Design a protein with these regions (language model features):
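Short, small-residue-biased leader/transition segments that mark boundaries at the very start
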Residues: 2-9
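A general structural signal for well-ordered alpha-helical packing
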Residues: 17-20, 43, 47
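Substrate-recognition element of Asp-dependent hydrolases with the DxDx(T/V) motif
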Residues: 27-46
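Short, basic/hydrophobic alpha-helical segments
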Residues: 17-27, 74-82
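Nucleic-acid-processing active sites and adjacent nucleic-acid-binding tracks
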Residues: 10-14, 18
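Short loop/turn segments at strand-loop or loop-helix junctions that form parts
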Residues: 8, 36, 90-92
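C-terminal cap/substrate-recognition subdomain and adjoining C-terminal extension
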Residues: 44-125
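Tryptophan-centric aromatic hotspots in well-structured domains and transmembrane helices
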Residues: 3, 34-38, 76-77, 86
Length: 125
């Protein structure tokens, strides 16, 4: 349709949103997004999308795009050396890159077991 702009919204699983919010609240954590969702959207637009799920106040930044997710996260961490406690959550296996800081989502969404694992990682000193 001429003059109509459409925007494909990613699928959100309500339980996953609740578990991510619980992780952020329990561990006083922030979200830095490295998903492909960030590639054509500003941080402000992403925060608006996250606001639909009560997560906007936790989304604080996005990584730059290098085409390599693990590299993007490493570069972000190098740029913020004050970040000591972090967890990388992804469906891709990045355990080799992030060892004791990684939770792999094997189901369709971040679930309760993932939440427990992420909380344990963030509470380690």
């Amino acid at each position: 349709v001429t003059g109509v702009q459409t925007c494909a919204l990613p699928i959100w699983y309500p339980k996953a949103s609740r578990y991510i919010r619980q992780l952020a609240e329990t561990c006083h954590a922030s979200i830095v997004l490295t998903s492909s969702w960030r590639l054509h959207r500003s941080l402000e637009t992403l925060q608006l999308l996250f606001s639909l799920h009560g997560l906007d106040r936790y989304l604080v930044d996005v990584t730059m795009d290098t085409g390599n997710k693990a590299e993007e996260i490493q570069m972000y961490l190098w740029g913020y050396p004050e970040i000591k406690r972090y967890v990388v959550i992804d469906d891709l296996d990045m355990e080799r890159s992030f060892k004791d800081h990684f939770v792999q989502v094997r189901d369709k969404y971040f679930n309760e077991d993932n939440l427990k694992e992420a909380v344990c990682i963030l509470r380690k000193e």
